[in-house]
Amino acid sequence: EDERRVGCLLHPLQNGGRDLRGVSFYGRELCDGHFCPSYHYISEVEKRSLIKILDSWYLYGLCVTDIDLVKEYFRLVSDGIGEMPPPGCFERPALRDAAGRFFSLKTTWPFRSSSVNRFGKYYFDGSQYMIRPIDYERLGVDKSVFDMIFLSLSSEFAGGEEVKEAEDIIRSLIDDFIRLYRREGGSFPVEEEMKTETGEHG
């Protein structure tokens, strides 16, 4: 009941001794000897926030392994409100739901590429993974300020109008959270673990 963080669901400890890590994108040997990049690059505050935002273990798994998506979201909302939202703020339903609508784009994004060899911003050419950039020049528009988010969502656009539509979706979700955060105001709960890490004592 106290275990809140999803671990590797392919690990033999989860499957009666069967090691299923060979079916992962990274392979068993890499998984066996390394932490996922998210372990190092997503901050403790961001991880705790994701745990509070996402009830679905599946969606949590998709998001916590997508470093760019997580970092960009919290950067954009932090720029808008002038501070990093504390994990405790997501105990308020309005803020949790607003953030959840953004991260649910991992499964609902209307501009997601139908290519089966895409994995977030990466595609597999048969021998290695590479990043497929969005050709904004071909689409007749400037590079989007949300480019990193678009790549994380495996975006593929038919034209410039779709890029603008996609930008409107992202901007609306970011602005919604900023507006709600300002409206909620006040102090938010500070978890005991966070107090210890930051040296705060009550």
Regions found by a protein language model. Give the residues of each.
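Short loop/turn segments that flank or connect secondary-structure elements
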Residues: 2-5, 10-202
